[in-house]
């Protein structure tokens, strides 16, 4: 299918009008909930953050003040000083910040006054909940943090999950979701006309997967040059240890210090066109281009090439053991909030949390021990007289609150700007930890029948903005059920990052370029991309982009995955001297949580770091 002459008109750019009826769909929300939830659902349709569509994640209004008073170094405005002194102020209402408040209550007592500040209009940080109510039935999307890697839980995290009532075994048993690998053809590739000259869906193969999904037998269908096809055929056919002459230490050194694309070129014989097919393969798992990874990292992530170093790829081990809620780990954030502020919802359990409506008006009430103040951007933190002063902007005004203790549960890279009194070495370590960009675009479609007709539930898109897309059906819990065989409306998740320009050579330049591009793109650009892909992929199966796309929510995370150390770009730091270890050192009554403090982009890491940060405050004996 050729690209339409007037793509904007033919792609049916009408999402703005569709979004206007989103609130009308919410009127039916109470009808689909248990009676105890109706009262909480009815008064909040217009301002309920999880239902907001278009640009979410780092949404408009969540980052401009931070950029102005940190990156652009405008002087912080003179604040209005609020009289109340809190026992604890937490900066950041993500899972780590919420867990810090939870642990603080356990360490110091439930009566302690806690204020949690966050620059977003919703809590949860990257654990973002997307709700869709078009048509009256609620559909959930994962706006950021996906799942629980339960096999990595330490006793601290396990105890928290048990206290919240999270039953991993039950979650696993209720879920049949597998990132789109549940269709008749578990693996599929879609080549688009704009990049490759024609739209081409190829089922049964993958660029990253077990040996049975090798594209070798499908290469003649690829819309690429004959030269690239011949190179790929040789690459996939060759079975030889090309590093046989290297001693074990030299072999390890090569695998860790050689870029994957250099390996593909020098040992695999792949030219630029063939190599480019793999460029986006790690967007979802790493938030990076594949050429940023070493050979060892890329092969460990499932990219091809083991056959060139004398190893045989395994057919097993491709199942990723994880536990899911329908809104991802937003359910963990919501369980924590309901524990900290019971007034947000009644009778909350881990079983019912997916369908529970929250009263956001209850988050910041003076009578409560814990308060969550959203849309509040912290711009300065100082210590004086045994107290921490926290200055923030909300509604165009500056305020300052005082606290005995403060936990910074926000991105490390912003800390040097808002905590100017920190030691220079600590600020340098914090600035080092630049996050990896990520984008998750959730699209509600009228019916999943076109996917079923094509025999797919997911597909990789090597030429498009989002590296992959997949249906979100199959995660069921607590009254929320959207089975794999449900032919009705469904959420399609588009997952990936934004490729930097070729001119960005080093890693930091690439991350900066991707980050700036992500924030600069208007919603219409993401919308046009989604419609082009769904129209090209599903058009022959009867999908009409104007009729069948009901809503689009773009979760853009320019500061996404925590900075995990890379073979090609980070040195082997001495114990205790890694940037994240220096960055998280307690400074007076100030401690540091967030997954950055563990240099690991996982929910359990965020919880572990919250526990450590609060224990450091306990050790002050104040």
Task: Annotate each PLM feature.
Residues 233-376, 573:
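Active-site/ligand-binding neighborhood in enzyme catalytic cores
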Residues 370, 374-503:
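Mid-domain catalytic core of redox enzymes
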Residues 16-31:
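N-terminal export leaders
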Residues 89-99, 118-120, 378, 405-412, ...:
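Conserved beta-strand->loop/alpha-helix structural units within folded catalytic cores of enzymes
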Residues 42-77, 131, 444, 450-622:
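Conserved flavin/dinucleotide-binding core of flavoenzymes
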Residues 142-151, 246-253, 318-327, 427-432, ...:
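Active-site rim elements
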Residues 1-15:
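N-terminal secretory signal peptides
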């Amino acid at each position: 299918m050729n690209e339409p002459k007037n793509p904007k008109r033919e792609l049916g750019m009408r999402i703005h009008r569709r979004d206007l009826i989103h609130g009308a769909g919410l009127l039916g929300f109470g009808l689909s909930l248990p009676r105890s939830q109706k009262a909480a659902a009815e008064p909040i349709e217009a301002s309920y953050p999880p239902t907001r569509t278009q640009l979410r994640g780092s949404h408009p209004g969540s980052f401009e003040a931070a950029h102005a008073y940190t990156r652009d170094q405008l002087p912080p405005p003179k604040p209005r000083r609020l009289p109340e002194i809190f026992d604890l102020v937490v900066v950041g209402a993500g899972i780590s910040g919420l867990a810090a408040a939870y642990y603080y209550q356990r360490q110091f007592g439930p009566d302690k006054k806690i204020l949690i500040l966050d620059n977003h209009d919703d809590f949860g940080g990257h654990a973002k909940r997307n709700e869709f109510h078009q048509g009256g039935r609620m559909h959930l999307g994962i706006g950021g943090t996906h799942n629980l890697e339960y096999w990595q839980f330490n006793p601290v995290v396990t105890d928290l999950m048990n206290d919240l009532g999270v039953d991993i075994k039950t979650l696993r048993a209720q879920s049949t979701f597998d990132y789109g690998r549940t269709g008749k053809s578990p693996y599929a590739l879609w080549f688009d006309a704009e990049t490759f000259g024609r739209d081409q869906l190829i089922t049964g193969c993958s660029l990253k997967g077990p040996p049975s999904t090798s594209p070798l037998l499908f290469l003649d269908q690829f819309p690429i040059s004959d030269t690239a096809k011949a190179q790929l055929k040789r690459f996939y056919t060759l079975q030889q240890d090309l590093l046989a002459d290297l001693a074990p230490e030299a072999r390890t050194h090569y695998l860790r210090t050689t870029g994957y694309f250099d390996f593909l070129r020098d040992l695999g014989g792949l030219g630029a066109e063939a190599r480019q097919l793999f460029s986006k393969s790690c967007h979802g798992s790493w938030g990076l281009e594949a050429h940023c990874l070493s050979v060892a990292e890329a092969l460990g992530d499932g990219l091809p090439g083991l056959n060139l170093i004398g190893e045989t790829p395994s057919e097993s081990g491709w199942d990723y053991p994880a536990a899911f809620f329908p809104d991802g780990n937003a359910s963990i954030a919501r369980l924590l909030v309901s524990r900290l502020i019971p007034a947000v919802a009644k009778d909350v359990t881990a079983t019912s949390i997916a369908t529970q409506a929250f009263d956001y008006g209850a988050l910041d009430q003076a009578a409560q021990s814990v308060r969550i103040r959203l849309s509040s951007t912290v711009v300065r933190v100082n210590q004086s007289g045994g107290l921490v002063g926290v200055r923030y902007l909300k509604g165009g005004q500056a305020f300052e609150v005082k606290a005995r203790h403060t936990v910074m549960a926000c991105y490390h890279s912003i800390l040097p700007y808002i905590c100017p009194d920190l030691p220079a070495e600590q600020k340098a370590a914090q600035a080092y930890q630049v996050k990896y960009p990520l984008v998750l675009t959730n699209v509600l479609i009228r019916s999943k029948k076109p996917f079923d007709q094509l025999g797919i539930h997911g597909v990789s898109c090597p030429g498009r903005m989002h590296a992959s897309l997949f249906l979100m059906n199959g995660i069921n819990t607590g009254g929320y059920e959207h089975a794999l065989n449900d032919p009705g409306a469904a959420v399609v998740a588009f997952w990936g990052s934004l490729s930097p320009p070729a001119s960005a050579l080093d890693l930091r330049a690439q991350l900066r370029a991707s980050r700036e591009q992500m924030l600069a793109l208007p919603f219409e650009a993401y919308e046009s991309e989604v419609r082009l892909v769904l129209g090209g992929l599903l058009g022959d199966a009867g999908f009409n982009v104007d009729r069948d796309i009901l809503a689009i929510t773009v979760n853009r995370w320019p500061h996404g995955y925590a900075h995990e150390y890379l073979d090609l770009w980070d040195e082997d730091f001495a114990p205790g001297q890694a940037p994240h270890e220096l960055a998280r050192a307690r400074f007076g009554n100030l401690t540091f949580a967030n997954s950055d403090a563990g240099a690991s982009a996982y929910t359990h890491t965020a919880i572990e770091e919250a526990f450590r940060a609060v224990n450091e405050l306990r050790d002050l004996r104040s």
